[in-house]
Amino acid sequence: PLYSSAASDVYKRQVGRNGSGKTMLFRALSGLMKVDSGAVTLDGRRLHKDFEMLPGLGIMLENAGLYPDLSAVDNLSFLMGINKKPDIRIIKEYISRVGLDPDDKRPFRKYSLGMKHRLVFAQAIMDNPSILLLDEPTNSLDEGGVSLIRELVLNMKDENRIIIITSHNREDIDMLADVVYSMSDGRLTKV
């Protein structure tokens, strides 16, 4: 098993070269991808069936689930509306938290890469998930964006969550990780 059990006060971190399987692992953990064998379990309980999103899960994959022709508010409203009635006040709060203007009406496709990355992060955290999977959370960000995302992640670390992060950024690893795993050819090794 990847983790025989997970304590919410433990911060896991994976590192590895491009193509080593980190993003694929996140897709399997989240239920977005069918796995050939095995199951995702937490404390001995199977968390989901294939292609069924884990309840209480926030996941950040590059541009995942966001629509190019919708504004930030419309994108997050649509995603929040899948499970419950969207609360525009909360949506705007999360857009502001990641340093974006909630009143910006531009479509997502017109955002810079860093702005897109911030919105994907907001999408991952807006339902206050108990388990958070973050794939390269500071990638494509300027210095201010990196500091902001690191601060948000550190704050969430103190809120009784399970957080698993992939990164190539050594500074992120040193600052954010309690436990580090390296991934090579689809295999995890504790560092």
Where would I find each of the regions flagged by the language model?
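Single conserved hydrophobic/aromatic residue that forms the stacking wall/gate
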Residues: 1-11
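Conserved ABC transporter NBD signature motif
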Residues: 38-53
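Conserved ABC ATPase "signature" region
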Residues: 77, 88-103
